[in-house]
Amino acid sequence: MTGELKGKIMNKIVKRILISAGAILGAIILVVGCYVIYVVASYSRIEDNLALTPEGSGSVEIATGEEYTVVTQNLGFGAYTADFTFFMDGGKESRARSADSVKACVKAGAEKVKSFDPDFAFFQEVDTGSTRSFKIDEREIVKEYFGGVSSSFAVNYHSAYLFYPILEPHGASNSGMLTFSKATIASATRRSLPISTGFSKFLDLDRCYSVSRVPVVGGKELVLVNVHLSAYGGSDEIRAAQMNMVLGEIQSEYDKGNYCVVGGDFNHDFTGDSTQKLNGGEEVDFGWAMPFPAEMMESYPAAVRAVDYSDGLKPTCRNCDVPYKEGNFTIIVDGFLTSKNVEVAGFEYSDHNPVVMKFRLA
């Protein structure tokens, strides 16, 4: 074989390799491009001031001077067993282990909250048809534990299919917040929180809080606000805007003469120093665990943060980059804010992350 012939053969081989590589690259670009178009085209925010339809009726009358119990619990879409790690926290997993695991986790959370016999209960990350939780309607599971009461449900976010991680995509998410009341909820509203308008909005998803109104003897209202603030994709400006809106809600209701209790997952270091006190004084920065902006409350004199714990500090959350074991990073992110005409009579954390508060209306 002559050198010229060898050269021609090599040129053909190289040409075919380049054509094949170009075709593969082109196909990848096309698929990625189509996916980006799908995500962008399917993105939409749920409208603000959306009226919700309360279900059921309660048998309790709310009056001043009486003691009531409220509990808040983030169900973590039914995935967070002790050894679960989450990819957005630096862990490995993007979905719950199994449908049975989801059901067991949700039932355990609902049972724990019910054990406090609360007059009011707030749940966050209640999935109703998400890939990550095997399309299980967690709302219906929780409702089985709270019969004979009034409830409202607000969709927090509904996302397009997230094709990441590649080997086990997180998928589509449909998740919301569920509020229970032994007194009848007269009306309820979904309020849209400020979120990023840039690309990070596709990571942060939609965000909201729900407002459930319960009549009080004498004509006023007890306003129950169930909240789940941003963790991923939120800038300092977005975090501040969300907190301003929540604090403004408290101030507005107080100015009307109403009573306001805000409970849920604030995705902040709720005490401002729990990351140090719960972790041996160590400064730990996971980005989303920013200190609660206590200085903002000066602009909302009616708002009070319930941090006078009767049983000491106990964590409500862990960073899910590694399976849990004693000594791992923990933090307090869940809690309650109230209007100052609500007297906090007792406050504690349970061993399984719900936050419990006893209060009276002044």
Tell where the protein language model's regions lie, with residue ranges.
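Active-site beta-strand/loop signature of hydrolases that rely on acidic residues for catalysis
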Residues: 69-75, 106-135, 180, 212-214, ...
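Conserved beta strand-loop-helix elements of the APE1-like EEP
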Residues: 143-147, 172-188, 327-341, 359-360
